[in-house]
Curated annotation (Swiss-Prot):
Record key words, sorted: Oxidoreductase, Pyridoxal phosphate
Residue list for modification N6-(pyridoxal phosphate)lysine: 696
Protein encoded by which gene: gcvP
EC number: 1.4.4.2
CDD domains in the cross-refs: GDC-P
Function in brief: The glycine cleavage system catalyzes the degradation of glycine. The P protein binds the alpha-amino group of glycine through its pyridoxal phosphate cofactor; CO(2) is released and the remaining methylamine moiety is then transferred to the lipoamide cofactor of the H protein.
Descriptive protein name: Glycine dehydrogenase (decarboxylating)
Gene Ontology biological process terms from the UniProt entry: glycine decarboxylation via glycine cleavage system
SUPFAM superfamilies per UniProt: PLP-dependent transferases
Essential cofactor(s): pyridoxal 5'-phosphate
Annotated catalysed reactions: N(6)-[(R)-lipoyl]-L-lysyl-[glycine-cleavage complex H protein] + glycine + H(+) = N(6)-[(R)-S(8)-aminomethyldihydrolipoyl]-L-lysyl-[glycine-cleavage complex H protein] + CO2
GO MF annotations in UniProt: glycine binding; glycine dehydrogenase (decarboxylating) activity; pyridoxal phosphate binding
Tagged with keyword Cell inner membrane: no
Classification via Pfam families: GcvP2_C, GDC-P
Native source species: Akkermansia muciniphila (strain ATCC BAA-835 / DSM 22959 / JCM 33894 / BCRC 81048 / CCUG 64013 / CIP 107961 / Muc)
Length: 948
């Protein structure tokens, strides 16, 4: 009988007899014996995790709700980049609450991700159309980091320029994040007034400028002349724009913007006490190859049909490493999909209507307040009014509060009110009366814009078919379902991606994210209104600190890569404070994730590679040599544990000692934390800082490429250098727009830890290890396991080596991954960390039946490869090279292949019961990059051309 709640037995796949069979196959009697032979004894935890006992699903939900009920939910019109929204129920129910959408992985395998890819193309089209710039990416983390990425983009476009101007009317949190990013990159940030700044005074050293549109105080400005003067110096112009405002006011592309960034939260996404939200970026065609993040493009499949794919991937961190455009990996795909569905559902006319209604309600409030004698400073506005109330700002905020509303205190003399689509005429009347101190007439009867005609948008947007076809709920529901059916997610099959930890995202964990108590708070509400969510975040931080063995944890980073960057910044700021700011060398093993060198470069560090030996372990002699050679300038080492080769390296504590002895800090990449929890921890090993991927180890879903949270845990000496924020009273080191990053979805991990308890968490780690070793044992005689520990065992993942087979058969590792789609699986991680190999991570959640199904598929694929090698199957026209096979392919009237239709589509009998069909055939990546298409209008033209 389990000593913990029954949730752990529902989360963990193999139970009872299945475990015994798996252990027997490995030659072990108990799980404890297996773990003892895998995890080095000198790093094992001496005591169980000091966490509360597991609760049932019902108990955990009740406890969390009781905590979150301590929040006070008022109507909030603070603005500053965050607004009340209405998520259409059809989108909430069929997308946000649907595991078919939230459990998928990043769409690196386009043949089984066409649904998400289509919606991301819709997202890009929406952004491009609204901003008036031809190219947009498929989301970034938040507006602050998007602005920081734009600064880097400008600098890369003009590498000899070291100065960047930021208008002082940008959102304060954005300015903080930019300052953090610039601190160790040698960029001089000037914050000032656009009207008095002379670009010519900086000249060739000016990389670019950033303005807010409308600005943080609500003013709509015409930047045409300013941008002309900036362009005269050769610098670039960046606009942080509100997409909802762009439905009715002039698009940035019309007045000379080179880059546009912002947040799509206004498009139906709850505020979430700061997140998650999908940021966006668009740019001119000339800058597209410098753009960070994922870019969706169009190509063709083997039948010549149009197919979506990730384009221009050579810009990304997993390929270019420290030379990448950014360290961005996980972004905000699910939120981008939600925002795009919002635009699809409302269409151009619906969006324009919402934008117009917001503005006219704001104008009605303007009219009521001015009639009551309250001065409004901005005459050209969209949704925000700047109240001039000398010495009375605090009193105004208090009056609004007493009436049930939050408004923004700008300074002692000014307050601001930002309305949104949730504002009603009753709200306007109540707010006006409260601020005026008497009953005030505030009829919603305005019918003309309050801005000068020059600011009115003249161009149409979102005219493409996708935005003009699905405006009834029936049509929308079916469109969502059609797209979902094109993607393989965890509700369909195991996703055995190594280093990705695609474990169960349980329904109970997901329930709280739609509670108003969790998702409707503005991140800048008074502290007494957010007691509940801050208590939840504090509990989560404390539990993560105990799990990692660290003194403190910051939840601010919005993704794992952001956590890496934040951790490195903590080290650099600590060293600078200690008078060792010259330390700028980062040692990184050659097996490391691509984000490691990319993050190091962002933190202003020089990357020095460390070799690995023939067994895949870090070459300790080379490490010692490099550490000693760079001891005067050594900042840190970045090390993943267990290693990216799937092995618990026996020398990890020695590694930490060597680095520390030479003046460096140890940064541990927490990507493989799923093999540590409850058995060991970064603090036990000797690390100084570690980031966690809550969307891996702690059960947060991947969302098809985000959202994620990448908190960092640090040792005592680094605690003062955790990320700050304006709302925390110290802004230095801010890496996100909100103090707690994507706060609302932290509830998922709170639930996971509460329901698993210390015993369940340890057992999950042990079972992840057992599952990986079971697969390695069953497949190792066909596909050699490339690296293993001293006793031939692996950690929580294993690298299968098909290189001799693929060489002899004239195949590639891609052929195996694509063929797995015919068997109903997402392929494992390909060619990382070793080219031509497959890295498999089954996680603890997969039952033995699913593991056996995967093993059977790989055994059959081995037989198919062998048939090619011995001449039984054709070397060119075979099931592997032609995979994946679509329903259209196998049902065609003509069949000219030397293998049968059933061999193509139903290679094992289990597929006769249930079959997942790839929506398109193999996608031509080269064609897609040579014929880059990134918006729907050009997709429609492209499709017609392909048909011709």
């Amino acid at each position: 009988m389990n000593t913990h709640s029954d949730f752990a037995s529902r989360h963990i796949g193999p139970q009872g007899e299945e475990r015994r069979e798996m252990l027997d196959s490995l030659g072990y009697r108990t799980l404890d014996e297996l773990i003892a032979d895998i995890v080095p004894a000198d790093i094992r935890m001496k005591a169980p995790l000091d966490l509360p006992a597991a609760k049932s699903e019902t108990e955990a939900l009740e406890e969390l709700r009781s905590i979150l009920r301590k929040n006070k939910l008022l109507k909030t019109f603070i603005g500053q980049g965050y607004y009340g929204t209405i998520t259409p129920s059809v989108i909430l129910r069929n997308v946000l609450e649907n595991p078919g959408w939230y459990t998928a992985y990043t769409p690196y395998q386009p043949e089984i991700a066409q649904g998400r890819l289509e919606m991301l193309m819709n997202f890009q089209t929406m952004v491009s159309s609204l901003t008036g710039l031809p190219v947009a990416n498929a989301s970034l983390l938040d507006e602050g980091t998007a602005a920081a990425e734009a600064v880097t983009m400008c600098r890369n476009a003009r590498p000899k320029a070291n100065t960047f101007f930021v208008a002082d009317t940008c959102h304060p949190q954005t300015i903080s994040v930019i300052r953090t990013r610039a601190a160790f990159q040698g960029v001089n940030i000037i914050v000032g007034d656009c009207s008095s700044f002379d670009p010519a005074s900086i000249g060739a050293d000016l990389a670019g400028v950033l303005v807010q549109y409308p600005d943080t105080l609500g003013r709509i400005c015409d930047y045409t002349d300013f941008f002309s003067r900036v362009h005269a110096t050769g610098a670039l112009c960046v606009v942080a724009a509100d997409l909802m405002a762009l439905t009715v006011i002039r698009e940035p592309g019309a007045f000379g913007a080179d880059i546009c960034i912002g947040n799509t939260q206004h498009f139906g996404i709850p505020m979430g006490f700061g997140g998650p939200h999908a940021a966006y970026m668009s740019c001119t065609d000339a800058l597209k190859r410098r753009m960070p993040g994922r870019l969706i493009g169009m190509s063709i499949d083997t039948l010549g049909r149009p197919a979506y794919r990730l384009a221009l991937q050579t810009r990304e961190q997993h390929i270019r490493r420290d030379k990448a455009t950014s360290n961005i990996c996980t972004a905000q795909v699910l939120l981008a999909v939600l925002a795009a569905f919002y635009a699809v559902y409302h269409g151009q006319e619906g969006l324009k209507r919402i934008g117009t209604e917001i503005h006219l309600k704001t104008k009605s409030l303007y009219k009521a307040l001015t009639e009551a004698g309250i001065a409004i400073e901005n005459k050209n506005f969209f949704d925000t009014l700047l109240l001039s109330v000398p010495g009375q700002a605090d009193a105004m905020v208090q009056k609004a509060l007493e009436a049930g509303y939050n408004i923004r205190r700008v300074d002692a003399d000014h307050a601001a009110i930002s309305l949104d689509e949730t504002a009603t005429c009753a709200d306007i009347a109540a707010l006006a009366s409260a601020l005026a101190g008497a009953e005030t007439s505030a009829a919603c009867d305005c019918d003309a814009p309050a801005w000068d005609p020059v600011h009115t948008r003249q161009t149409p947007f979102c005219t493409e078919k996708a935005f003009n076809s699905y405006h009834s709920e029936t049509e929308m529901m079916r469109y969502i379902r059609r797209l979902e059916s094109r993607d393989l997610a965890l509700n369909e099959a195991m996703i055995p991606l190594g280093s990705c930890t695609m474990k169960l995202n349980a329904a109970s964990e997901m329930i709280p994210i739609t509670w108003p108590e969790a998702n409707s708070l503005h991140p800048f509400v008074p502290a007494d209104q957010s007691e509940g969510i801050r208590e939840m975040l504090s509990i989560l931080s404390d539990r993560l600190a105990k799990i990692t063995g660290f003194a403190a944890v910051s939840l601010q980073p919005n993704a794992g890569a952001a956590g890496e960057y934040a951790g490195l910044l903590a080290i650099r700021r600590y060293q600078k404070h200690a008078g060792e700011g010259h330390r700028n060398v980062c040692l990184i093993p050659t097996s490391a994730h691509g984000t490691n060198p990319a993050s190091s470069a962002m933190a202003g560090l020089k990357v020095v590679p460390v070799k690995c030996d023939e067994r895949g372990n870090i070459d300790m002699a080379d490490l010692k040599s490099q550490a000693e050679a760079h001891k005067d300038n050594l900042s840190c080492i970045m090390v993943t544990y267990p290693s990216t080769h799937g092995v618990y390296e026996q020398t990890i504590k020695e590694l930490c000692d060597i680095v520390h002895a030479n003046g460096g800090q140890v940064y541990m990449d927490g990507a493989n934390m799923n093999a540590q929890v409850g058995l060991t921890c970064p603090g036990c090993i000797g690390a100084d800082v570690c980031h966690l991927n809550l969307h891996k180890t702690f059960a947060m879903p991947h969302g098809g490429g985000g959202p994620g949270i990448g908190p960092i845990g640090v040792a005592e000496h680094l605690v003062p250098f955790l990320p700050g924020h304006l709302t925390l009273g110290h802004e230095e080191g801010a890496v996100a727009s909100a103090a707690w990053g994507s706060a609302s979805i932290a509830a998922i991990c709170w639930m996971y830890l509460s329901m698993m308890g210390p015993d369940g968490l340890r057992e999950a780690t042990e079972m992840a290890i057992l599952n990986a070793n079971y697969i390695a044992k069953k497949l190792g005689h066909l596909f050699p396991v490339l690296y293993s520990g001293n006793k031939g065992l692996v950690a929580h993942e294993c690298i299968l080596d098909p290189r001799q087979l693929t060489h002899d058969a004239g195949l590639t590792v891609d052929d195996i991954a694509k063929r797995l789609m015919d068997y109903g699986f997402h392929g494992p991680t390909m060619s990382f960390p070793v080219p031509g190999t497959l890295m498999v991570e089954p996680t603890e959640s997969e039952p033995k039946k699913e593991l056996d199904r995967f093993i059977e598929a790989m055994e059959r694929i081995h037989a198919e490869i062998t048939a090619i090698i011995n001449g039984t199957a054709d070397k060119e026209d075979n099931v592997l090279k032609n995979s994946p096979h679509t329903a259209e392919m196998v049902s065609a009237d003509e069949w000219r292949h030397p293998y049968s239709r059933s061999e193509a589509a139903y290679p094992v009998s289990g597929l006769l019961i249930h079959k997942f069909w790839p929506y398109v055939g193999r996608v031509d990546n080269v064609y897609g990059d040579r014929n880059l298409v990134c918006t729907c209008d050009t997709v429609e033209e492209f499709s017609k051309a392909v048909e011709l």
